[in-house]
């Protein structure tokens, strides 16, 4: 951009309960600097320091929240007068996952991973009605999160998308739900954690 950006960087613990995203203050992962001033055309490196080990075999989820702090000075037009403008305060939310010993979810080109430690989401789904509106409910009983994209309900040759692109995340042990595009019947499928191929999600038993 053409203006100096003042940013606040915070890291929150992230969980899911009652079909909602939950955030908590925490000191397990610290972002530095907490406030940054970035001049036009420049970059800012943010360092993340973990102060506490993750329990073995577990995945912990965090959200890095980057907020733009509005300037106290109004924008100035080319003629030197105060410019009338609509100013938007931007917010960026970046997921962060930390793993305990014996668990991993992505390949590491720098070192060999133990195949026994690979963590996979274990998903199932069902339909529910909330105030007479159909919803798709997805449960994750696996050890790691599931990032769901391009999710659709398929019935024969027809496909009804729940979302174009990112639908959302389901953290380990959590249940999330999303509104369905009409009555639900058929198969639920989508891309899980960026997989190249669309995968079917089994119905709940």
Question: Language-model segments: which ranges?
Answer:
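Short edge beta-strand/loop segments characteristic of extracellular beta-sandwich folds
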Residues: 49, 135-141
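Envelope-exposed proteins and targeting segments
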Residues: 5-7, 27, 34, 42-44, ...
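Gly/Pro-rich, tryptophan- and cysteine-flecked surface segments typical
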Residues: 2-11, 27, 49-50, 95, ...
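A structural detector for beta-sheet-dominated domains
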Residues: 10-12, 32, 99, 121, ...
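Beta-sheet-dominated interaction scaffolds and their linkers
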Residues: 1, 112-133
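Terminal connector regions
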Residues: 51-113, 120, 184-205
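Intrinsically disordered, low-complexity Pro/Gly/Ser/Thr-rich segments with frequent PxxP/GP/PP motifs
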Residues: 19-54, 157-187
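Short acidic, flexible loop segments centered on an aromatic residue
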Residues: 1-23, 141-159
